[in-house]
Amino acid sequence: MKRELSGYPQRQPQRASQGSQLWNWAQNAQLAEHHQVLIPGSEERLREMVAAAPGRLRVMGSRMSPGRMLALDAPEDRLIDTGLLRGMLSHDAQSTTFAGGTPLHEVYELLTSMGRMLHASPGVIASQTLAGALATGTHGQGLAQSSIGDEVLRIRMVLADGSVQTFEREHPWFHAVQLGLGCLGIVTAVTLRTRPAAVYTCFKHAVSGDSLATDLLTWNRDYALSKAWWFPEENQVHVWTAREATDCECAQYHDNHGDPVVYQDTSDAMNNTVDRTLKQMRSDTQIRDENGKPFRTVTRFKDFSDITGDIYQVFCRGIATPQINVEIAIPLARAGAVIERIRRWHAENKPHLHYPVILRCTGASESWLSPAWQQESCFFGFVVYYAEDGSLSAEGLAFLQAVEKLLAEEGGRPHWGKYFDASLYSWSALYPQMAAFRAVREALDPQHKFSNAFSQILLG
């Protein structure tokens, strides 16, 4: 079966909408034949399918990951669709248990209706499944938390022989299961610790990039949540900083019936920068619709309206559009030096920057294979959107390849659910617990039933 193990494949929406093949969400990789997809309606049926499977198995949620994470290798292999295994299973005063196939937006909506929230900040896209978010290390922003997986209290999995095992935080293998890459078993239930829902006020600013290396630390130390977009060519930064709302702001929010309160403000500080970026993006993508999704992700940088709302209303605002997304974690203590290296490299080489550099920082993670394992980290994000015909800007891709190589040289760890060039990384050197993770895999899945070409190369 054709797949990409590295590099950046073209989109093929026409082929993906026809024929017998199942493609990933971005429509740039074939995953399986439709007849190879199994859809269990219960955990018991899933156990039967796993026990009887003649080949290897991979699990799909929303299919938003690169093809290498999900693609099957042989006719006897099967892809498990967990779409029917969703919803809230139970809850108590401090935690809630969801089925693994529950989309994150349903998790957030159910918690909000209960007056609860996760301790972890959400990622920008909420259509992925809870189990998929754990498998790939999905994270948000804020140094007081790390990935969604770090808020897990208990994980229930169907193992390779069809049996079921529950892993709690005290289990010696728990930190392997927290971020398992889909290689240890099929997650059917996840218990997440929760807290009373809070309201946040987010402030939006445009600032010079001159002091970004130090400003980044200040924003993240002084505010509960912070996110920044850096335009190196224009030496500007669009930054969001958020804190818990004051009593007065909370009252305004509740008086607005739980809808976000937007404090309308106008500023032309980013207009020229945004217009230049849009012009370049139009040239790269040849997308004719001026209101197309890629353009909306940029035009919103002209918006400086502060906002009060719950954490999901404020930060879970991604616009899902097909793209190549590369995200590399660097220890926060070294992020400033890496920013300065990127700045010097950009000034010397003047690369074609398709989209601003996204900067999100998190606290240390306990997951053995988390890019933020045991250290506060800054995730450097880079995006190139697909053109109308499914192609990618050659100059934009050249930038991605060069900047990923630079970050890999700095000891960067890539986000598992996004695109990266695996040849740049020495996994055992980057992840001191890699050998321990492999040992857990051998114990839980000695025949490597939950495997494919990519995971075999990664884990052996």
Give, region by region, the residue ranges found by the protein language model.
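C-terminal substrate-binding/cap subdomain adjacent to the FAD-binding core in PCMH-type
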Residues: 135, 153-337, 341-344, 348, ...
